Amino acid sequence: MEFTKMHALGNDYIVINEFDGEKVKEEEKAEFSRKICRRGFSVGADGVIFIQKPTSDEYDVRFRIFNSDGSEAEMCGNGIRCFSKYVYERIMKKNPLKVETKGGLRVSEMEIEGDEVKKIKVYMGVPKFKLKDIPMVVDGYKEDDEFLNGELKLKNPYLPKVKLSVVNVGNPHAVIFVEDNNIDLDFVREHLDVIGKEIEHHEAFPERINVHFVKVLNPNEIRIVTWERGAGYTTACGTGTTASVIMAHKLGKTNNRVLAHLDGGDLEIEIKDDGVYMIGDAVMVYDAKLINIGW
């Protein structure tokens, strides 16, 4: 089976083209993704992207993504940029591209040089803040309430409680501003495996959640450290960056256009009246043929 390895800001994916036919059986996709993403034993990646025909005529193409633990995600910002580049360069010269995702419609606009996609601007939709959209269950809050810089108790020895905000941008995110928690990003990096994992699996989040630690540098710049649901630490997260900027702006910490610095590089996020836009690139690394999935 042929596949393509791609990355966006160091977030790496195995891309499988199923536009003209299924290559991995539906019931096997989760286990296949878990095995092939295992670094050192198989190809290794943060996730697997499947390109498929859309389920209705309102879309051009369908995006599906499975995390390295085999769980299927609703959306992925870095993944959809890789996806959009692949689709334009190898399947259809459609620009803008209307993409069907589990999180709803996403529209990719591409900056083209020759036949190559250099930059992708993705319409990320309108954020949802109600607890029922996360979902989140916490005492004292109703399902239509928002959770903005609210406090959760933790059980780890490093951070007994945390102030965080939640938002859904196609998938759910918890955004933690380090300055509001009297910690810094060095502390976060030292204890990320413990704190990030606990928040991801916290009982308040029955479907788990992505976790982002944010330092506001100035009204136009932030720095982010990410713990992704189903993947753990990653060098970048497009939807998480979008969520972080949305929350920073909503809480009055930044302007509506922000440059976000991540371990894998930079992303630009712009908040407009009709929704949120993410701007960044993607890289096609190599094509290969899978001989053995590994174990």
Swiss-Prot record:
Disulfide bonds: none annotated. Its main location: cytoplasm. This is Diaminopimelate epimerase. It comes from Methanocaldococcus jannaschii (strain ATCC 43067 / DSM 2661 / JAL-1 / JCM 10045 / NBRC 100440) (Methanococcus jannaschii). The record marks H173, E228 as: Could be important to modulate the pK values of the two catalytic cysteine residues. Pathway: Amino-acid biosynthesis; L-lysine biosynthesis via DAP pathway; DL-2,6-diaminopimelate from LL-2,6-diaminopimelate: step 1/1. Homodimer. GO terms for biological process: lysine biosynthetic process via diaminopimelate. Catalyzes the stereoinversion of LL-2,6-diaminopimelate (L,L-DAP) to meso-diaminopimelate (meso-DAP), a precursor of L-lysine. GO terms for molecular function: diaminopimelate epimerase activity. It is found in: Cytoplasm. Its EC number is 5.1.1.7. Substrate binds at N11, N67, G77, N78, N171, N210, E228, R229, G238, T239. InterPro entries: DAP_epimerase_AS, DAP_epimerase_DapF. HAMAP family: DAP_epimerase. It catalyses: (2S,6S)-2,6-diaminopimelate = meso-2,6-diaminopimelate. The keyword Amino-acid biosynthesis applies. It comes from the Archaea.
